[in-house]
Amino acid sequence: MTKSYGENGLILAETPGCRGWVDECLSSQDENDLEKKEGELMKEDDEDSLNHHNGEENEEEDEGDEEEEDDEDDDEDDDQKPKRRGPKKKKMTKARVERFKVRRMKANARERNRMHGLNDALDSLRKVVPCYSKTQKLSKIETLRLAKNYIWALSEILRSGKSPDLVSFVQTLCKGLSQPTTNLVAGCLQLNPRTFLPEQSQDIQSHMQTASSSFPLQGYPYQSPGLPSPPYGTMDSSHVFHVKPHSYGAALEPFFDSSTVTECTSPSFDGPLSPPLSVNGNFTFKHEHSEYDKNYTFTMHYPAATISQGHGPLFSTGGPRCEIPIDTIMSYDGHSHHERVMSAQLNAIFHD
């Protein structure tokens, strides 16, 4: 701070004008400096903002270019291959191919062993069920059905404690089976399938009862359901209808009247059915010629031929016989048309 001295050496009072001028000069310089600095700062800020903005624009342009390139690549890929959804498939290498082959071979071996075991089990089951044939092999489903029926029949026997008759047992076995399997079961059990089929058993039973009632044991006029009754006298039904009983005759007793017929009889003249024969796996029933058909000839139509050949009587056992006087016999031309038709039918039955 400057002090002014006078001539006499006294300090004069400070003049306010100089100080104010100095302050003003200093303040004006400071303001100019500040303005310059602020201007420089403003310029720097403007430059930084411009640079940042330009950088963002450049980045956006670069990203846009990249997206366009990606879109173009995707379009090209879409044009070449269809777009696949889901996880991407891995590339097949040699190691993966080998692993796939080994895995497939193991799976095939497991399936083959499983089928072999199943076939062996079915073969052993076929030997247990009552329908075993070396020539004819049951299918898998038929084997299982027959085994189910067999188990059910055995369980019913154990539950009731009584042994059923053969016909009902076979009906239980053949329930739900096909006709070839039913025939095979009947053949193995020595039965005729027509005797135990549900739809035919009632008809057969009624037919048997009608036939047994029309054939009494005593002498009777010769009658047959399918042939006219010739006036040739009387014959004994025990001789005409005598057949060889089979091992399954006891199973067919419900179809016959035990009070009137003591042996297995047949209502028709076709002869008894023999046990089924297996020809290439197919069981068939054939008619057996009766003993009277094999050993005797029916000679009531032509007694003159019997006398000339010297044959003995028709039946050797006692009982009413067919005795016709020779004098009353007319020639063959003298018979009526009805008698000729009837004799032809009888001749065909006893001589075929």
From Swiss-Prot:
Region (Disordered): 1-96
Keyword Cytoplasm found: yes
Domain of life where this protein originates: Eukaryota
Post-translational modification: Phosphorylation on Ser-266 and Ser-274 reduces protein accumulation and inhibits ectopic neurogenic activity.
bHLH domain sequence ranges: 102-154
Biased composition (Acidic residues): 57-79
Composition bias type Basic residues, residue spans: 82-94
Pfam families: HLH (PF00010), Neuro_bHLH (PF12533)
Compartments where found: Cytoplasm; Nucleus
Tissues/organs with expression: Expressed in differentiating neurons of both the central and peripheral nervous systems.
A GO cellular-component term linked to this record: cytoplasm
Entry protein name: Neurogenic differentiation factor 1
Native source organism of the sequence: Xenopus laevis
